[in-house]
Amino acid sequence: MTSTLSPPTLALRWTDYPLMDAALAGLCVFCDVRDPEQLTPEHLQEFQQWAQKAYFTPELSGWIAVVFTSNFINYSFSTEKRQEVLRDILSSYQRPDTLSERCTIFPELQAQQRVARDLMPMLMGRGPMNFYPDGQPGLPLSGQAITALQGLSLAAPLVSGRAMILDADDKQLLLDVVNEWQKPWLKRISLSVSKDDKKPIWAAARTRLMEAIRQVLSKQPRGKAHLPFAGGATIYHLSNSGQGPDAAIYTLEQPALRFMERASQEHPEAWKPLFQSKHHAADKTKDSDFGFRNELDEAMFSLPDAAPAFLRRYLLPPFTQALKVAQESGKQASKANRKKDTKKANDGPKPIPLSGLWGITELFLEEVVGMEKARIEAIEALGQRLGEWIVRENDKRLFRELYQARGASPLRHVLLKAMLEKSKQDAKSGAENRDLITTKDEYLRIFTEADELSRADFTLARDLLKMRVIQYLHDARFFEENKDDPELQNTELPTDQGEE
């Protein structure tokens, strides 16, 4: 093998190519620098010394089979041959780039060789010529690029049998997250001494990223209204295995991150129990620290596109549960074994404070849905006026009709009926405060478009109004005081089957 002195500079930089940038982030964290332009030949030599031992551990051998196919771990090779092939890859940056083509990733550099899937994930093998320019298989890469790509071993841990490769709009976030992953990943590699020593696996890639971001945020001073980094992040959860190469792509948008951070900071009393209620502990096959899954974390990757479904699945149920608890409490009170049933009821999960949850819902509408502030305030105000009227008149029938109204016409009927009843009462009592329950302008702002047709998100607005009314009634102890009332007992929980 011919080698030359290392180049005085490596000419490495961020590329906006996810595989390379993740690899560079791994090298930067390993070498304790914050920019790939600061990487030196001495840093790569330090990595080379680590890799020559670590790559032959069972843990990293399995990782290599997933990311770089069998490569130099091919067990048909002798031990000496495998070590020689590895040295050749790790020292690529020390040899001259002699091809006439430019490097695909660093076009300012000449290429050293055309590479296939054994040196760059998700390409084809060395033989096939299809889908390559001029029928020449492989992509031209410089020696620096070939060696740098091995930095993926420092940045892309194996999660559920696939490499978890992160791309971030803000490279400082990429570095910080890789920093959170690298230490436990390297510890796992160092403890891997025997093929028969099967360690519990890492799992739930999306939860792993959210957990790492929370760790990053917990270490940085920040204001409540902003994040210390820009943009979002994407996970490429991939396998380059010859048995079935595949990649799942999960995108985490900035609005979802802002919502998560603000909710946890501004309403911790509601966010913490909500978050914990969606936690699923790791089973015995998974690592206890890196194998658990959280539904809320996973659902963040569906935002903002699936915002209505998110609200209906995670934010609405605690509000409807408040009514259900009151109904169950009323039924238990009439049973002979009341104490036994009450004890069982108290053994359930801690209820989520609805006032805090409504605050979280408002943040969700602001950050994720992008709803205008005037409309949010109108929904909140209408819900409060309805709640005040129901409590004042103890009007359980009105609550029942409002709660079960699904379409625009039934909802308008309920609102008109409430307006009429309040107007009659105000006239009869001579009350000075004769504010209407709602007005035409308020109704149009909440439920209709400019042409006075129902909004496309009418169902969302309807659910938000019900959530606000329930929150007010719950805080006013309306459900608790009327738990035995037949009208409340007969209020059926509506089904949202078929609604999006």
Annotate each predicted stretch with a short phrase.
Residues 20, 24, 35-48, 55-56, ...:
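Low-complexity, charged, repeat-rich alpha-helical/coil interaction segments
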Residues 1-80, 453, 459-460, 464-469, ...:
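Conserved small-residue
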Residues 198-487:
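Intrinsically disordered, low-complexity regulatory regions
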Residues 60-203:
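Basic, glycine-/proline-tolerant helical and adjacent loop/strand elements
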Residues 40, 170-171, 407:
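Alpha-helix initiation/capping motif
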